[in-house]
Curated annotation (Swiss-Prot):
Pfam families membership: Ribosomal_L30
Cited Gene3D superfamilies: 1.10.15.30, Ribosomal protein L30, ferredoxin-like fold domain
Name of the gene encoding the protein in the UniProt record: rpl30
Protein name: Large ribosomal subunit protein uL30
GO cellular component term of the entry, any: cytosolic large ribosomal subunit
Length: 154
């Protein structure tokens, strides 16, 4: 199952090693999202940057909405059903299914690997962006509930 990783906190006061990890994850700005496979290497990177990001397993429907609404090609061109069919030879639904099941990596497609999202409508959780999701905040692992956050941000 692929992870959706969203950067929540900014760059002020970030240690150098964590800043490098966020760069390797391609999370240069707040509210940027990447889809990564569930591998040991990426899990280590996520664990290191857990105080600046939130992550969880993305579902197919949310990924389809993200690709169609926020996905971009080179030159900042928008994506639609016909474009994906023409470039990839498959529908958006098939592409999303393969990305979620880690058969294809998003970076191996012509789609840009970073989704630039809005801040969440109605805000983050009540405890804010400095506390873990388990205690009511916005940071760290949130499992399947990442889809709720992404739907607020699309």
């Amino acid at each position: 199952m692929a992870y959706a990783v969203v950067r929540i906190r900014g760059s002020v006061g970030v240690r150098g090693s964590i800043a490098d990890t966020l760069k390797m994850l391609r999370l240069h700005k707040v509210n940027h999202c990447v889809i990564i496979p569930n591998t040991e290497t990426y899990n280590g990177m996520i664990n290191k940057a857990k105080d600046f990001i939130t992550y969880g397993e993305i579902d197919k429907d949310t990924l389809i909405k993200m690709i169609l609404k926020r996905g971009r090609l080179s030159g900042n061109r928008r994506i639609d059903q016909e474009t994906v069919k023409e470039l990839m030879g498959m529908s958006v639904e098939e592409l999303a299914e393969k990305i979620v099941n880690e058969e294809i990596l998003l970076k191996d497609t012509p789609i840009k690997p970073v989704f630039r999202l809005h801040p969440p409508r109605k805000g983050h959780n009540k405890a804010g962006i400095k506390k873990s999701f388990t205690v009511g905040g916005a940071l760290g692992y949130r499992g399947e509930k990442i889809s709720e956050l992404l739907k607020k941000m699309i």
